Amino acid sequence: FDSSSDYPGISAFVSTDNSASATEAANRLAEAMGESGEVMLFMQDSKSQVAQTRENAFVSQIQSTYPNITIVETYHMDQIDTYKNQMIQELATDKQAADITEEEVIDYLFEKHPNVKGCFASNSDAMELVLDEMERKNVSPFIVGYDMNDDSMEALKAGKIDGLVVQNPFGMGYAATIASARAALNMGNEAFVNTG
């Protein structure tokens, strides 16, 4: 359900097609940017299959289709310590890594890449990082990302977000329940159930 596994006993995988949806997100962001400029990616982590699939598909689509768009940075939220140490070295600051906040890391990335025109956020947490930066630093990149919650809907209505990939959690749960029942009854299942 939602995230694949290499466990051999899985009878069905129920999820959004993360590759196709990230490809569409790349197309939408490129369109909003006029098919040129610098992009930063904000990924929820560097390890989960969902994040890797979304990142790889997004990057592949941008690199293969939009020669005038450059991906200048990919921020993985689970690698914040690496970014903190990079900041300390590059900025020659006396701060310790433990004293640097995630907000300061995001500020640093936008200062390092002042010409960023677009941002891709792989989930709602990553989206919040970009939206918070917009509020703090008065930057206004084009933004396309995943997941809908109250904050992202409000930002979309206000024109702060240019596109959202919205999954179907009800459909995922329903399809997973049906697939589980079919597995319990020794009935066949599709190997992959795309919930849109």
Region spans (language model):
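Loop/turn elements at helix/coil->beta-strand transitions in domains of secreted/extracellular proteins
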Residues: 9-10, 34-38, 65-72, 113-118, ...
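Hinge/cleft segment of the Venus flytrap/periplasmic-binding protein
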Residues: 50, 61-72, 171-196
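Short, solvent-exposed amphipathic alpha-helices that sit
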Residues: 21-25, 49-71, 82-87, 101, ...
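Short beta-strand->loop
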Residues: 15, 40-50, 75-78
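Hydrophobic alpha-helical
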Residues: 58, 78-155
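Extracellular/periplasmic ligand-binding modules, especially the Venus flytrap/periplasmic-binding
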Residues: 122-131, 157, 167-185
